[in-house]
Amino acid sequence: SSPNGLARKEFIKNRAGNYLVVDNQSGEVRGTAPTTIGYRGSVVVTGPPTQLSTNADNGTTYDIKSWFSFSSSSLYSLIQNNFPRFHNLIRQAGLSQDAYNRYSFISDNEIYTVFAPTDSVLNIWLADTTLTTAQMKQFCLMHFVQGKMIFTDGRQSPGYYETLRRDETSTEFITVYSKVYIEPGIDLIHFPDKSGGDYIDINESGATNRIAGINLGTGDEVFANTISNAVVHAVNRVFEHGLMDTR
């Protein structure tokens, strides 16, 4: 796909399983890590690419001068470093495998969107809330959407998206996951409440669209073999299943 220029930033998946970040304000195009002079270079460069082709029937070619770089920070590390209170709550719920630096409910064969509450929001909410371990688990998993990477560029359609929360309609033999209604828009992601009002708007900022990845290699490769598997957005309200538009 190609950028349409509507959002401040657009996220275009490449053939290697990573994302190119298109800044429609500055014109810069980069990978999920800063662009450098030379592969894995120390000098960071910015700037728009130069279009070379104008009449191709299956794409457009650009000259970028420097090397795109792609981060392989894991979802576990990203949440641990940027949302320590949420990370610790996941651990308390028994959902982490700390010895392996991973969450037990995350699969390397799936993609995710995570709406991670900030430390301040969680501290305020938890001050007046007591959770059992089972409730804590359900609460944490409500913030994970599986099967889609939703950015603030409006490329996904509005609809009910499957979370990792085990729904009450599940049985001993069948697991049903709760779904939450999401309206991806231009420079924001909107969540209605159960009455059709506003629950939360997540506006594009430096605290949104943080991309995590998986390193498929040993770490000794000249060219890193990584793919993107999750995007994380900071949220200033916790996700409460009973208050949101869910099914």
Describe each PLM feature range.
Residues S1-R247:
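Mature, structured domains of secreted/extracytosolic soluble proteins
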